[in-house]
């Protein structure tokens, strides 16, 4: 039986905010018996070891390339159940600085390899910190975290992911600036009537995060005061800045961190 819009929206809210691992379905309980972690955040199917091999060969459940927190079947399922809800989340945007100039100094193949190293390094760290990749676009990566997926310390994990990404990119000589913010956004599967959809987050706080990231120089992580407070991190001696952001009516206070 098809779910109503209200049921779909509640599913999205509870899954993101409450606990992504509390689905009480028989197949979920069964999958949890198979070794071993890491697992799909929705159905609990294992990705590695013998359990992962069984899931891939018998059930056709491989790890999603875009969101390693999901298996491919669950990602397809949530995309087909379009809907969403306003939820508390933490958001991260990371951009390569001076990408146009870099591309002019490199062959197209070498530039593509640099972008790929950026994508691979960033998404691996986001997955390790239980974040969800929203998009890989051009020279940027966007991701978000919620309590149901990453735990109650999801804002802290977002900041930790930003520090790891910054350190990883510095080691690879890839100039990246990062912005981190937290607030309420609309989260869910959005798309067209023909069934094409993406798991996305939209709203003022998402736009604010993108604008914050645009102000970060290479090697800098600009974290909003709101995110720092929610993470329980004391600003201490961290450099303070007040940003005027395009399209944002109010100034935004941030602190400067590094990897």
Walk through the language-model features, giving the residues of each.
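Catalytic NTP-binding/metal-coordinating core of nucleotidyl cyclase/transferase enzymes
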Residues: 81-160
């Amino acid at each position: 039986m098809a779910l109503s819009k209200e049921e779909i929206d509640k599913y999205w809210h509870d899954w993101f905010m409450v606990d992504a691992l509390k689905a009480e379905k028989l197949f979920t309980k069964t999958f949890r018996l198979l070794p071993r972690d890491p697992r799909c955040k929705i159905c609990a199917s294992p990705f590695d070891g013998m359990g992962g091999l069984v899931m891939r060969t018998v059930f056709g459940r491989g790890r999603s390339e875009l969101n390693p927190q999901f298996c491919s079947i669950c990602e397809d399922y949530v995309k087909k159940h379009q809907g969403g809800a306003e939820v508390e989340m933490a958001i991260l945007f990371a951009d390569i600085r001076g990408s146009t100039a870099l591309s002019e100094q490199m062959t197209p193949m070498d530039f593509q390899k640099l972008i790929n190293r950026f994508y691979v390094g960033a998404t691996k760290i986001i997955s390790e910190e239980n974040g969800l990749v929203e998009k890989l676009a051009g020279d940027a990566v966007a991701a978000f975290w919620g309590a149901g997926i990453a735990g109650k310390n999801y804002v802290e994990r977002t900041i930790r992911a930003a520090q790891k990404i910054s350190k990883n990119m510095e080691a690879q000589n890839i100039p990246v600036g990062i912005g981190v913010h937290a607030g309420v956004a609309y989260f869910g599967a959005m798309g067209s009537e023909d069934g094409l959809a993406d798991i996305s987050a939209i709203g003022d706080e998402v736009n604010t995060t993108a604008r914050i990231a645009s102000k970060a120089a290479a090697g800098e992580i600009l974290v909003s005061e709101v995110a720092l407070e929610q993470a329980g991190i004391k600003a201490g001696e961290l450099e303070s800045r007040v940003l005027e952001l395009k399209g944002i009516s109010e100034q935004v206070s941030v602190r400067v961190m590094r990897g």
